[in-house]
């Protein structure tokens, strides 16, 4: 095999892998908020993105942030309130207040439905 063939094959595999990775994650604009809006009237894309940002910024400080659909709604409702004080302690400030906690829980619900 020639060096050119190996190089071309490697580039092709890399490009296909990148395209597959980009297409596999839900983008924020592709999220369907219908279920969350039925459960939480007035829930908006702004609420979703705020909850998502709080989750991403705080819930991976001490451990990997879990996928929203990795736990049930009841499990999240049990664990998030227990984890918020630890996340705040790790941040050295109140990074997540009560309303932030609610936005995180609603984000997890919306992202898993």
How would you describe each model-predicted region?
Residues 55-65, 104:
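The canonical Cys-X-X-Cys-His
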